[in-house]
């Protein structure tokens, strides 16, 4: 194994992007970046500073007053404070979903990720616009997908394991609605790039998906 590369994993909701990316990062000893955490950190800052996250310009102005950092242990820092656990709060998650829709904020996050990944190789990242927006120059691009039914079933099982009441039909409807929204959003709609390798995990287990990506990565090192 020689030089490290950067890996981008894209795909629809419920495809297991984050779980797979984290496991691949461990096997390759890469740094895992979750773009969603950056949006959550911005949302948390807006809440803490009393900024109206329903107003794009207010959130954008706030960005000049904050500093976000990541480390190799998947921790995210807001103004020097480790907020990795705090950003998991439901209130923060809801605010982040709103903030992530704003073009100005998305542009800020793109620049943030570009600066990190230009410093060195050995990063793996997931997200619904990673292959074409956040890491367009990644040496390995993966579009991880699966049928809505399989993705909904996996998500329902995950929720059940976490102790949440889950209705499969409700989850399936949510997955299909999210797919439509992601594919038709005005800014950076979800799509498969020409240089991405599609992995359909419908008939694959977790280990098979991870091993496939690790193998593809090693071919490019």
Curated annotation (Swiss-Prot):
Its main location: cytoplasm. It is found in: Cytoplasm. The keyword Isomerase does not apply. ATP binds at residues 11-19. One of its GO terms (biological process) is pyrimidine nucleotide metabolic process. GO terms for molecular function: ATP binding; CMP kinase activity; dCMP kinase activity. It catalyses: CMP + ATP = CDP + ADP; dCMP + ATP = dCDP + ADP. Its EC number is 2.7.4.25. InterPro entries: Cytidylate_kin, Cytidylate_kinase_dom, P-loop_NTPase. It holds the Pfam family Cytidylate_kin. One of its GO terms (cellular component) is cytoplasm. It comes from the Bacteria. Keywords: ATP-binding, Cytoplasm, Kinase, Nucleotide-binding, Transferase. It is an enzyme of class 2 (transferase). SUPFAM superfamilies: P-loop containing nucleoside triphosphate hydrolases (SSF52540). Belongs to the cytidylate kinase family. Type 1 subfamily. HAMAP family: Cytidyl_kinase_type1 (MF_00238). This is Cytidylate kinase. It comes from Mycoplasmopsis agalactiae (strain NCTC 10123 / CIP 59.7 / PG2). The gene is cmk.
